[in-house]
């Protein structure tokens, strides 16, 4: 048994010693079978939430009404959830009521996809009543039971299905795919925040291109923020190598760039994204407008925009044009390393120095002089030392020698 499960084994053993059933469930078991990195370990048990909290000294009630308690074991937090069933769903997104049960089978039966409905006991034996292992072996995503019923319970499951395509490279079971096509409109009931979370995971996956194509094919894109009129652009976006975009800002920036979005800020706000990310994307897009070609970078421009923003913009441009991303990043890094100063903070003089030397009160002129000095330092006209800069200003007849 792999280490992440070993660390949590004490929880299962404690529950079993007190007469309860307990199993590892969900994504961790799936990822074990896929030989992927194992994330959070989740445990399902026949013990009720109150019973779980009585057994363990350190617990956090994060939703006992829905059956979930966090147990802190050896300094690590684990979600322990009581076996449960769910009644009719409300608004295509949440169950009207949760009923605690003592049956693992009933608990697994309520889950979304067969690959996520596998349990593992303390000895490593798998309990797989719905064919999850077979689905994994065949690289197929299919629902537990009737896909139309699963998607009408929680419409976000349709996005999750395609997100898993993006992450795992699996194919959609034909019945599952057809149910998404027929029920795509239900996605309109889902909050933007939940859709954004799934969409970001989709874009981050190694098979994002395949997933984007499926968003169009199934019609789900029609119910995603500001994508209704972007069918052709999305199909084009699916042809690019998204693996080369290695940050959140680069992925959203590339999407705006390829979709020809008029206002990136409006588009990203529609997805309820944070202001910091919006500013990051806007900067990358501004660079692409300001610097027409990757060969147009100068020391001054790179100092102005900064290496991180420059690399983001050039990555977007390179992926869009099919050019060598690493080559452009390397050139930018080399140019940046050649800069005598990398940021404004590294300049040897301050605004106070300038006001003292010029014998004048502050104003916009101070920033103009500092910018002039920055350019001179960057281009090697003067060393970045306070005395040298002062002499340079005198030599340029900008200040009188006696003002020092």
Curated annotation (Swiss-Prot):
Task: Kindly list the positions annotated as binding CTP.
Answer: 27, 30, 111, 154, 157, 160, 163
Q: Which residues bind Mg(2+)?
A: 40, 42
So where does ATP get bound? 27, 30, 111, 154, 157, 160, 163
Q: Which reaction is recorded as catalysed by this protein?
A: a tRNA precursor + 2 CTP + ATP = a tRNA with a 3' CCA end + 3 diphosphate; a tRNA with a 3' CCA end + 2 CTP + ATP = a tRNA with a 3' CCACCA end + 3 diphosphate
The misc remark on file is: A single active site specifically recognizes both ATP and CTP and is responsible for their addition.
User: What PANTHER family is this protein classified in?
Assistant: CCA TRNA NUCLEOTIDYLTRANSFERASE 1, MITOCHONDRIAL (PTHR46173:SF1)
Subunit composition? Homodimer.
Q: What is this protein called?
A: CCA-adding enzyme
User: Native species of this protein?
Assistant: Geobacillus sp. (strain WCH70)
């Amino acid at each position: 048994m792999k280490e992440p499960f070993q660390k949590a084994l004490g929880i299962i053993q404690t529950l079993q010693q007190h007469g309860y059933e307990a199993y590892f469930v969900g994504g961790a078991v799936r990822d074990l079978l896929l030989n992927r990195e194992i994330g959070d370990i989740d445990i399902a048990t026949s013990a009720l939430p109150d019973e779980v909290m009585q057994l363990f000294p350190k617990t956090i009630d994060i939703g006992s009404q829905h059956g979930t308690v966090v147990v802190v074991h050896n300094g690590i937090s684990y979600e322990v959830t009581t076996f449960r069933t769910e009644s009719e769903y409300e608004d295509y997104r949440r169950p009207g009521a949760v009923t605690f049960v003592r049956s693992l089978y009933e608990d697994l039966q309520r889950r979304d996809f067969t690959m996520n409905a596998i349990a593992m006991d303390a000895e490593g034996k798998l309990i797989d009543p719905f064919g999850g292992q077979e689905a994994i072996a065949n690289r197929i995503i299919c629902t537990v039971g009737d896909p139309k019923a699963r998607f009408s319970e929680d419409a976000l499951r349709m996005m999750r299905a395609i997100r898993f395509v993006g992450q795992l490279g699996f194919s959609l079971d034909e019945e599952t795919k057809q149910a998404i096509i027929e029920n795509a409109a239900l996605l309109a009931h889902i909050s933007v925040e939940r859709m954004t979370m799934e969409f970001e995971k989709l874009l981050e996956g190694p098979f994002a291109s395949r997933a984007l194509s499926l968003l169009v094919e199934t019609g789900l894109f029609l119910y995603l923020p500001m994508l209704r009129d972007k069918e052709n652009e999305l199909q084009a976006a699916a042809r690019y190598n998204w693996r080369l975009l290695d940050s959140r800002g680069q992925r959203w920036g590339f999407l705006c760039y390829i979709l020809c979005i008029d206002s990136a800020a409006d588009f990203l706000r529609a997805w309820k994204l944070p202001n910091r990310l919006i500013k990051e994307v806007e900067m990358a897009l501004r660079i692409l407008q300001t610097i027409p070609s990757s060969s147009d970078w100068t020391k001054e421009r790179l100092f102005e925009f900064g290496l991180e923003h420059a690399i983001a913009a050039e990555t977007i441009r390179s992926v869009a044009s099919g050019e060598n991303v690493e080559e452009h990043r390397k050139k930018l890094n080399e140019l940046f390393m050649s800069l005598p100063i990398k940021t404004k903070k590294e300049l040897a003089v301050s605004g106070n120095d300038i006001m003292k030397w010029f014998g004048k009160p502050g104003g916009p002129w101070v920033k103009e002089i500092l910018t002039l000095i920055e350019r001179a330092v960057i281009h090697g006209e003067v060393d970045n030392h306070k005395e040298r800069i002062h002499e340079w200003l005198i030599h340029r007849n900008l200040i009188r020698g006696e003002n020092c």
